[in-house]
């Protein structure tokens, strides 16, 4: 047993990969050879507006983008990817989709399906989906927030802090082991 917990046979890592992406009009993207060949801008003027305002992040999703997101969700569910959350991100034309947590090996495969589905469905909406981590200089890039956890086969979340110092021992031990592993490897 692990620090007084019930016997467990194995631990199960789970992941929820939040995929960020940019959407641009296909007709405009086709006017840029750098976007066509590199999937990002390589030259050009700085963005006309900084990111100091949160009007995009907290703004309403535009109708065209909302239709795209709706179709992406339908296609992902057909593939068995339980996508549920989508929203604007910080930079103009930047968005995010977040599938539901699942076992790590399945989540990685599903993220590949998510990226392919985003690109395919974007084309049907006259959009170009850009997954490059830094497609535009001077604005936020597109990352992949990798939320993860470790759960025993008994359903105990090993990364959940306890309410008392005694209940917190397991969490602190697991956290110390993770930190040591990251430092060593």
Residue ranges and their predicted role:
Residues 6, 20, 147:
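Conserved beta-strand and immediately adjacent loop positions that scaffold enzyme active sites
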Residues 13-28, 98-100, 137-142:
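Short, conserved secondary-structure transition motifs
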Residues 27, 82, 86-91:
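Short glycine-enriched loops at secondary-structure junctions
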Residues 10-15, 83-87, 128-132, 185:
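Flexible, glycine/charged-enriched surface loops at secondary-structure junctions
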Residues 31-32, 38, 73-84:
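Acidic, glycine-rich low-complexity/disordered segments
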Residues 2-9:
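Short, small-residue-biased leader/transition segments that mark boundaries at the very start
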Residues 35-70, 90-91, 95-108, 112-116, ...:
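Loop-rich catalytic cores of soluble enzymes, especially ATP-dependent carboxylate-amine ligases
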